[in-house]
Amino acid sequence: MNLLFKALSHPVRRRIIDMLRKGPMASGDIAAAFDMSWPTITGHLNALKEAGLVSPEREGASIRYRLEISAVEEALAFLLAMTGAQAPDEDEGTPR
C-alpha cells in the first residue's frame, strides 16, 4: 500500500493515471503528452507499475500501458475505511 500512495503522490503520475482511464496507451503516446525526457517518463511509468497501478503489454516494438482498476479500488477502499465512510454499492450506487 505504501508504494501505491507514494506513486500517487506525484502530479505527473496522477495525470498518467487520468490519461489511462480512457483506455490503454502506448508509452510513446504517454511521453508525447509531457515536456519531459524519455528517462523521466520511464521512471514515472516504472513507479506506477511497481505500485500495481498500471500494467505493461508489449505490442510489437512498443509497450502499451493500461490502468489496473483493482489497485485504484483497493486504495479507495483503504481510504474510505480509514475515514469510517462506506463505499457505494456498485449495483445500486448506495452505501453498503
Segments from the language model and where they lie:
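Glycine-centered, phosphate/nucleic-acid-interacting loop/turn motifs that mediate DNA/RNA or nucleotide
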Residues: 52
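Short beta-strand "wing" residues that participate in macromolecule-binding interfaces
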Residues: 56
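N-terminal helix-turn-helix DNA-binding core of bacterial DNA-binding proteins
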Residues: 2-40, 59-72
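Amphipathic alpha-helical dimerization/coiled-coil segments
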Residues: 22, 69-96
